[in-house]
From Swiss-Prot:
It comes from Psychromonas ingrahamii (strain DSM 17664 / CCUG 51855 / 37). The gene is metG. It catalyses: tRNA(Met) + L-methionine + ATP = L-methionyl-tRNA(Met) + AMP + diphosphate. One of its GO terms (molecular function) is tRNA binding. It is found in: Cytoplasm. This is Methionine--tRNA ligase. It comes from the Bacteria. Is required not only for elongation of protein synthesis but also for the initiation of all mRNA translation through initiator tRNA(fMet) aminoacylation. CDD domains: Anticodon_Ia_Met, MetRS_core, tRNA_bind_EcMetRS_like. Zn(2+) binds at C146, C149, C159, C162. Coiled coil: none annotated. Its main location: cytoplasm.
Amino acid sequence: MEIQQRKILVTCALPYANGPIHLGHMLEHVQADIWVRFQRLRGHNIHFICADDAHGTPIMLKAQEMGIKPTDMIADIRASHESDFSGFNISFDNYHSTHSEENQALSSQIYIALRENGYITNRTISQLFDPEKKMFLPDRFVKGTCPDCKADDQYGDNCDACGATYSPTEMINPKSAVSGSTPIMKDTEHFFFDLPQFEDMLKVWTKSGALQTEMANKVGEWFETGLKQWDITRDAPYFGFEIPDAPGKFFYVWLDAPIGYMGSFKNLCDKTEGLNFDDYWKKDSAAELYHFIGKDIVNFHSLFWPAVLEGAGFRKPTAVNVHGYVTVNGAKMSKSKGTFIKASTYLDNLDPECLRYYYAAKLTSRIDDLDLNLEDFTQRVNSDVVNKLVNLASRTAGFITKKYDGQLSNHVSEPQLYQSFIDAGTSIAALFEQRDFARAIREIMALADIANKYIDEKAPWALAKQEGSEVKVQEICSMGINLFRVLMTYLKPIIPKLAARSEDFLAETLDWEIIKKPLAGHRINKFKALFQRIDPKHVEAMVDASKDSLEADKAAKQKQAAAQLDAAKSELDKEPLAPEIDFDTFAKTDLRVALITKAEAVPKANKLLKLTLDLGGETRTVFAGIKSAYTPEELEGRLTVMVANLAPRQMKFGLSEGMVLATGPGGKEIHILNPDDGAKPGQRIM
C-alpha cells in the first residue's frame, strides 16, 4: 500500500546561547531526530530546524564579564552548539539564531499585528532596580533569603532548597546579583500581551490532541486559576530587539524566542528553491507542525505561543511533544549550578550512537523523567547492540565471504520467518509514529532474539564440517544476513552511523519498503567491525572529566537535604509514626511490583479508579481512591507497588483484590509509588 506523503515541519526548543550543550539538552534533540529520521525513511517531506536563543540580560551581562560584544559571544556559542549537535548526528536542515534579520522582521510583524488587532495593552508597573548598574533586574538577578524556608543565597523567583515560588519583592534581604547593591523599587511602562482574550480558543486547542493528556490536564489547572496578561517588555540596557515605536523598550526574550522557529525556517526557505514559508505557517496550512520541548517550558508553548500565532493570523502547532528531565545515576542535573555532563565531554570519551540507543530504549510518549544510569547504560548497549544485533551479522557473514565469495543464497530458505519480521514492521512503525521508542526497541530486540535463536539452532559452524552441506550452510547464513538487514532498517533512525556502516557491508541502502523483498543472489562486502563495545573505563573517564561540576553540587545537595529534612519533620508533626511492630509482623505483608495494564473510571464514583494489575502472570482488579490526582491514561503502562496478600474486599462497584500504595494529603496531592528502572511485575519488595 502506497503511503500518502505528508508535509511536516519539526522544531526543537532553542538552546540558550550562554553556555554549553549538556546531556539534558541532548535527550530532546535525539528524541526529535529519531522521529524525523523515521519520517524521512517512510518517504515524507519533512524539514527539521532549530536555532540558538540569543537574547536577554544573562547574555548581555556574561558578555560584559568576558569583555566582549554579545554578538561575538553568541557567535562562539552557536559554533560550539552546532558542533555538539553534529557530533550526536542530529540531522537539522537548518540551524540559525534568534539574533537575525529574519527573526527581527517577523517579531516586529507579529507585534504590530497583535497591536492592530487589539491584543497589546500598556501600563505602568513597579520593578526592582539596581541603582549602581542603573538597570531593572530580572527575577534571576535578584538573590536573597527564601521567605518560606529561610534558605540563604536563593534566586528571586524560586528556592532551590524547598521548591517554593515567589516574587523577588517577597524575599528577605534581597540583593542585586549584578552589583551586590540593595535594589530599589522603580516605575516603568511595559507592554502586555492580552492572553485572557484567547481563553476560549485555548481551552479547545489544548483538548484537541495537540498536547499529551498529562499536559492538557496541567493546562486545565492554569485555566482554573485564571489567565493573566503577559509582560513582553524589557527596559534598556538589554540585548535584544527594540520594540517598534517604543525607544528604550525591548522585546522580552520569550516573545522573539518562539518566533525564532519561524525565523530559522524563513532562513531555510530563502536558500532552498521551491520551499515556501507560507505553505507551512499561513493560517489554513495543511502542513503539520510539531514542537519538541521539555516540561519546564510547557506554559509558554501551550498558552502564550498558540495565542500569539492566533492573534497575528498564523497557524497553530499540530502538536507540542513534551519530555521529562534527565538525571544521571538518579541525581538531578542543574544547568544553573553547572552540575551537568557536557555533550563535548561525552563525545571525547564515548560513541554518540550508544547514548542515542540508550535514550531511545527509555523514551516513551509520556513525560516521565529519564535516568541515565551509567552501569545500566553500559550493560544495555553491549547486550542489545553488540551481542544481539552486530553479532548476528558477524557470526554469519564470515561463512558467506570465505566460502561463497560474498554471494547470498539464490532463495530464502525460511520465507515464513522472514515475512514475520516484515509484518512486525507495521506495529514498529506505529510505535515510532507515537514516539514510543522504548516499546519499538523491545519489539525489535525480541525479533533479534528470534533471529539469533534460529542461527543457534541451525548451527552453521557445526553443519559446515559435514560433507555436502555447502548449500544448506549458505541458506542458513543468508537467512541470518537478511534478518539482520530488516532489524538494522528498523533501527536506522536511532543509530544512523551504524546503519550507514551496515549499508556498506550489505552493499545496499536500508529502506523500509525495499526490505519487503529479501536479498537473493546478492553479493555482500567483507564484514568489518561495525560497532565497538562500551568499555567501562571510558565511562569512568567521562565521569572523571565532569567531576569538577559534579563535585560543585554536593554542597547544594546537602542544603537541599537539610530543607527536605525540615519538611519531613513538619509532615511527622501532622501525622506521627505508628506504633512499633516486630519484623515477623511486617513480613506478613506481601508487597509486589505490579504493572497497570488498564485503568478506567468507575461510573458514579467520585474518587475511585478501577485498575487491572499484572503481577507477572496473575491479574488482579483493585479499586483505588486516586481519581482526583490521575486520569486513566496517565496510569496505563506504569509500574506501581501493591499489597498482594490483602484479603479481597467486596465493594459497591466490584471486588477489590488488593491495594496500591500512595502518599499525600489527598485531592490532587496523591502520589502512587513507582519502582525504579529495572523492576519487573511480580517481584517482591523486600
